[in-house]
Amino acid sequence: MKRLNLHAGLVSASLIFFLLLAGCKSTPAGRPVDPLELIDAESSFYIAVPKNADNVLIERIITGFYEQASESDAKMIAERVNKVYCGLNRSKRSMEVQASIDGNIPRKYLPKLLNGKNGWVTSDYTPEGSLENYKIYSGQIEMTFPSENIACIGRNLEGMLDKFDALSKLPADDSTELYTDLDSETANYLKGAESEIRFFAKNPQSFLTILTGAQLDLKLIDVKGNFETDPKHQNQYLLDLDFLFKNGTFLKAGKTLLTLAFGLTNSQEEIIGDTELIIRDIRIDKQQLYKLLSI
């Protein structure tokens, strides 16, 4: 496992997207594997970024972590990406990333990019009990391409390949929607991201600090929510947040702090039961999300 610094972090992103098809073998006959199924439960923050929600964000991921990518290259690559799933663990000096990417990229870029001259080291990996052999490419970031439409990057690639190999051998008519290490509610929530960016935070403190600019001790269990581009202000998102507090007392105190931090009105808030607070239509600058992702 490699721990990535912030800008080697998510990627040599343009390489990842260029090579989404380039490094792959044919998908074995059997059940199609969903990219989300390869994300494990060891991250503290999860985000699903569909192309339809904010193509510019995907371009920013590319150019922010692979400086050699031109603006035109980033646009071309982003057009071939359908959705990015990421699990993140942040510290003061680094970000640990696990990503599974759904896309469609031509094979012709492989010989030009994944070679020793460009600083890449190739190794082979065969899951226990399998006859399949997978290539792992190590450079600024580790990556692998288990199928024609999936790229995996970052943490625990061998575990992701183990999962892919096992799932791809299931019968093609297997009706199970998702085999996931995440709890079903979180997985289905992320899977449903089509026209909006969705996230789930098991450790939401740093997330809230970036959004509000304040250190808020809210005694939370978790936070989930979504970002959509504000149709009236293309440089802003409308953000919905769903807070789960440890108890009702913490909810009341947290509601007061959040009202002040976001400048909320009563019409934007809804309390469900004793511990859940939903806040809708918070207007934030897109740069705040880019900062959260360090791009």
What role is predicted for each listed range?
Residues 2-13:
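Bacterial N-terminal signal peptides that target proteins for export
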Residues 21-23:
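C-terminal motif of bacterial Sec signal peptides marking the signal peptidase cleavage site
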Residues 25-28:
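Bacterial signal peptide processing site
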Residues 34-36, 42-84, 122-237:
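An internal, short helix-loop-strand segment that often contains or flanks glycine-aspartate motifs
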Residues 47, 94-103, 149-154, 237-246, ...:
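Short cationic amphipathic helices and targeting signals
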Residues 92-121, 166-173:
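Long, charged/polar, surface-exposed segments that mediate recognition or autoinhibition
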Residues 117-129, 264-271:
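Short secondary-structure junctions
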Residues 190-295:
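Leucine-rich, highly hydrophobic segment in Treponema pallidum outer-membrane-associated proteins
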